[in-house]
Amino acid sequence: MHEHLKEKLAILPDQPGCYLMKDKQGTVIYVGKAKVLKNRVRSYFTGSHDGKTLRLVGEIVDFEYIVTSSNLEALILELNLIKKYDPKYNIQLKDDKTYPFIKITAEKQPRLLITRNVKKDKGKYFGPYPNAQSAHETKKLLDRMYPLRKCTNMPDKVCLYYHMGQCLAPCVKEVTEEQNKEIVDEIIKFLNGGHKEVRSELEIKMYEASEKLEFERAKELRDQIAHIDAIMEKQKMIMSDLVDRDVFGYAVDKGWMCVQVFFVRKGKLIERDVSMFPIYDEPEEGFLTFIGQFYENSSHFKPKEIVVPGSIDSELVERFLEVEATQPKRGKKKDLVELANKNAKIALEEKFYLIERDEERTIKAVDHLGKQLGIETPYRIEAFDNSNIQGTNPVSAMIAFIDGKPAKKEYRKYKIKTVQGPDDYESMREVVRRRYTRALKENSPLPDLIIIDGGKGHLAAASDILENELGLYIPMAGLVKDDKHKTSHLIIGVPPEPVMLERNSQEFYLLQRIQDEVHRFAITFHRQLHGKSVIQSALDDIPGIGDKRKKVLLKHFGSLKKMKEASIEEFVEAGMPKNVAETIYTYLTDKKTL
């Protein structure tokens, strides 16, 4: 531990507040809150921890703290600090997990819509629904029963919905505000749990229509009743008071937390939300951070009541979220909390089973590879491969594996710029120089291990640039192939020594995946460039086709094969003048030319 950390730990206050952990670049990597700052912050640097917390602690070189006047103030401040710094070790709930709602618009002639984008407008929203199908089934039923406007714009004549009796045609007829209000009130009553009353009213109308011998109308009403029964049968009633509530449960194991939320609407359990994330705080603190972020998501309405497990301070939740929070001791609510807890525990068990299987292939394989090479665990591996088939369009590619998995956003492609002809060694020197010069300039992460797809010459070329030109000392290994071009072994060190791996070991399989992936990425890039050059050379002799039109054709068609299959009209659609389109078509279909 750094000496200045010991000094700062010694003077921590025993008051509530937030703390900000920083790495060697001064970047905030974790934000936490505590009832007693002194106890919580010191706990990171004492005692035993799980692997994830050890990794966090291993990156901490400094920290700051902010004292607050209460736990509630610390909770609010923590959420704001997380939003401000976006620390990599904090929970970051995604905003893309949204549920569908039925919306009654606030337009003069209102409409019914399905939306996942809940806005603070004057529209009325009902939901969330468990899935899009459920929402669409309910809307379809309401469309049949209540003739609100269906069209987005006002057409100048009536549409099919009017003739089907599902629209009052405000586009050509006067529909008063009172008429719309009556329909909207009926829809609201239905969506607020009054479907039984609506069903009874429809049943009465059906019998009246039968007595008047209006059998077509009676059949239509009977079908509407059947649709109501079918939809409502799918939603099981679990609470009789019809209160909208969210029921929370959680489980913690091996440094991970799972939170399950049951959405109860109008007495029915309609959906659940499952979130899993690493936790570095006490479970209660982690849960409070989660629930704060949960309701910041625009798709999560605060219900009338929130039900939390017994270990959570419900009064703090109530003050924090400004909504009624309960901690049930018995009854159906307690049963639901226990069910949510149980589901959370099962979800974690399943996750760890899958993690164990995945880790054998990834992080454990990475750890074993590091031990075989005599280096620290290479959490980030970058691999290079050249491709210059037939000496044309020489390229190189770099891929990255983080924790044993491909990190495709980190992949890079390189056109060889300074090397004339097929020279693998010089190409490798150029690419390594470009990659790590830029990494140093942009202060981007450096790898723990570099793998060069090649033998001693490739390794020597890359090492020379890395160490003698750039002053970087990163472990580097050459990936040697056998006579069948398959992974054989690694070479490392000066002079390079072979490192033989068990062929049925996970670290060997990891190297095979890296080799296959970097080769695939390089060869795909090479083929793309080669394909472009083939098209361009095929177009060189066509009158009226310059560089600009070549690029347009290449972008539009993508391949010479598609161009040869295209009609004159398709060349015109691509932006070619009619006479040029005819020239291209004639040239490409001339068998003597191609």
From Swiss-Prot:
PROSITE patterns: GIY_YIG, UVR, UVRC
Main location: cytoplasm
Gene Ontology, cellular component aspect: cytoplasm; excinuclease repair complex
Keywords: Cytoplasm, DNA damage, DNA excision, DNA repair, Excision nuclease, SOS response
Any Gene Ontology biological process: nucleotide-excision repair
Function: The UvrABC repair system catalyzes the recognition and processing of DNA lesions. UvrC both incises the 5' and 3' sides of the lesion. The N-terminal half is responsible for the 3' incision and the C-terminal half is responsible for the 5' incision.
Family per similarity comment: Belongs to the UvrC family.
NCBIfam families per record: PRK00558.1-5, uvrC
Protein name: UvrABC system protein C
